[in-house]
C-alpha cells in the first residue's frame, strides 16, 4: 500500500517533498490511469516520475540517483516508449504503483529475489530466467560503473572519431592531389 511505500513512509516521517496522491494523479483533473490524458497512464507515467527522479527533481536532495529518467530513455524500453509503444515497460511496470519500495526491501518488485517474477509478468517477458533478469536495467554508458558497456561505448566513440578523422584527412589529401593535377594540366 502507499502508506508502506517509500513515498508514504517518507511523507509520514515529515518529508514534505515526498509525493502524495495529487503529486502523481493531479489535483482537480483526475483521470482514470488507463486513459491517455491521465498523468499516470502508460503514455505519461515516466514523465510524471521524472518530475522528482529526473535531473531537476528532488531526488538528489535525498541521495537518490537522478540519472534514472535518462537511463530509462536510453534503454530498450525507453526507446520503444519514445516510438509510442504503450505496451512496453515503464517506471510503474517494474517499480510498482502505490507500493514502491527500495530495492533491498524483500517486498520490492525490484528486489533480487523478485525481479524474475517482475520481468516475467504476462505481456512482458513470460519466459524470463534468473540469467535474463540479472542484466543491468538503468545503465549509464558514460559511467565506469557500467562495466563492459562503458568500455564498448568508449571503443566505438574512438573508432567513430578515428574513422571520421581518417576520412577527413583522405579528403584533404585528395583535394590537394586534384589541385596539383589541375595546375599541372594548365
Name each model feature, range by range.
Residues 179-186:
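Cytoplasmic C-terminal tails of single-pass
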Amino acid at each position: 500500500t502507499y502508506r508502506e511505500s517509500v513515498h508514504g513512509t517518507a511523507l509520514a516521517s515529515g518529508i514534505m517533498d515526498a509525493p502524495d496522491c495529487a503529486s502523481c494523479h493531479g489535483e482537480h483533473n483526475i483521470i482514470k490511469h488507463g486513459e491517455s490524458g491521465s498523468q499516470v497512464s502508460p503514455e505519461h507515467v515516466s514523465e510524471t516520475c521524472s518530475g522528482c527522479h529526473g535531473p531537476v527533481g528532488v531526488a538528489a536532495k535525498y541521495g537518490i540517483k537522478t540519472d534514472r529518467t535518462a537511463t530509462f530513455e536510453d534503454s530498450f524500453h525507453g526507446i520503444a516508449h519514445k516510438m509510442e509503444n504503450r505496451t512496453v515497460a515503464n517506471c510503474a511496470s517494474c517499480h510498482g504503483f502505490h507500493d514502491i519500495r527500495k530495492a533491498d526491501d524483500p517486498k520490492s518488485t525490484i528486489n533480487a529475489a523478485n525481479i524474475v517474477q517482475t520481468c516475467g509478468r504476462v505481456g512482458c517477458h513470460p519466459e524470463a530466467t534468473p540469467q535474463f533478469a540479472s542484466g543491468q536495467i538503468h545503465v549509464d554508458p558514460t559511467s565506469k560503473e557500467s562495466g563492459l558497456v562503458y568500455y564498448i561505448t568508449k571503443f566505438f566513440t574512438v573508432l567513430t572519431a578515428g574513422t571520421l578523422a581518417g576520412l577527413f584527412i583522405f579528403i584533404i589529401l585528395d583535394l590537394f592531389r586534384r589541385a596539383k593535377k589541375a595546375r599541372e594540366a594548365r
